[in-house]
């Protein structure tokens, strides 16, 4: 017999969440991440996969900028939610 100890402070909902990251070019990359993992992990993985620099792009959820320290739980993200990626706009005069 194996003893299974109930985890304290853990909700009955799944600890992982599936998120989609949608680029401006129409590409969609899916990630599975823990609800309490900082989104910087997902952001860096997306940049590595797409060959981009973190300085080149911005991530937004529901129109709001995402900070690297934010977690899916803090932003009340649900399974299959989409994060939008935008190229960093550099100011200039035409």
Swiss-Prot record:
Annotated family: Belongs to the ubiquitin family. SUMO subfamily.
Organism of this sequence: Xenopus laevis (African clawed frog)
Positions of crosslink type Glycyl lysine isopeptide (Lys-Gly) (interchain with G-Cter in SUMO): 11
PANTHER family per the UniProt record, alphabetical: SMALL UBIQUITIN-RELATED MODIFIER (PTHR10562)
GO-annotated molecular function: protein tag activity; ubiquitin-like protein ligase binding
Cross-link (Glycyl lysine isopeptide (Gly-Lys) (interchain with K-? in acceptor proteins)): 92
UniProt KW keywords: Cytoplasm, Isopeptide bond, Nucleus, Ubl conjugation, Ubl conjugation pathway
SUPFAM superfamilies membership: Ubiquitin-like
Keyword Cytoplasm attached: yes
Location, primary (coarse class): cytoplasm
Pfam families listed in its UniProt record: Rad60-SLD
PROSITE patterns: UBIQUITIN_2 (PS50053)
Quaternary structure and interacting proteins, as annotated: Interacts with sae2 and ube2i. Covalently attached to a number of proteins.
GO cellular component annotations of the record: cytoplasm; nucleus; PML body
Protein name: Small ubiquitin-related modifier 3
Residues in coiled coil: none
